[in-house]
Swiss-Prot record:
Its EC number is 4.3.3.6, 3.5.1.2. Catalyzes the hydrolysis of glutamine to glutamate and ammonia as part of the biosynthesis of pyridoxal 5'-phosphate. The resulting ammonia molecule is channeled to the active site of PdxS. Pathway: Cofactor biosynthesis; pyridoxal 5'-phosphate biosynthesis. This is Pyridoxal 5'-phosphate synthase subunit PdxT. The keyword Protein biosynthesis does not apply.
Amino acid sequence: MKIGILAVQGDVEEHEYAVKKAMDELGISGDVARVKRIDDLRGLSGIIIPGGESTSIWRLTSKSNLMNALRDEVSNGLPAMGTCAGAIFMAREVKDRIMGETGQGVLGIMNISVVRNFYGRQRESFETTLNIEGIGTVRAVFIRAPAIVKYWGSAKPLVAYGDNYPVVIENNMLALTFHPELTTILVHEWFISNLVKK
């Protein structure tokens, strides 16, 4: 098993640690690889698109065509987990809480609508406890977090928080609007056990 982590910007090391620890807990032998170029997508069993600054990540990857290649791989069945900015990239619809339409580049592969900076800026970041279907109770850290405000088709929420959905699954894709890598390995274990190992 080989799990890739899009390693342009964001919580790359934290995800690496969480994946390695999850593999150990599950008794799985595997590798974690940083994905920076199209060639790095070869041979992956799954990929994680971490949080970070979504516009910067898109800008840094658009010239190399990496995002187009990633879109093709995930559309063809590569299991993918997107956290925070990663959820923004996976969404078919994206708006900003203040600016509205942004024209931001996205993969557009998941039947979800995301609002960037839903809770506000950095100072409105917060933590809460979520009981996620199939995963369990986790401490969720929301940092300048987006919100999934709508889902359709085969997309299914695994938990609701007020009027939005912090975790949504659709086929081979899992989108989270918080940062599981900061507090738990339960989400990474679930991703590996239920989507990657399928």
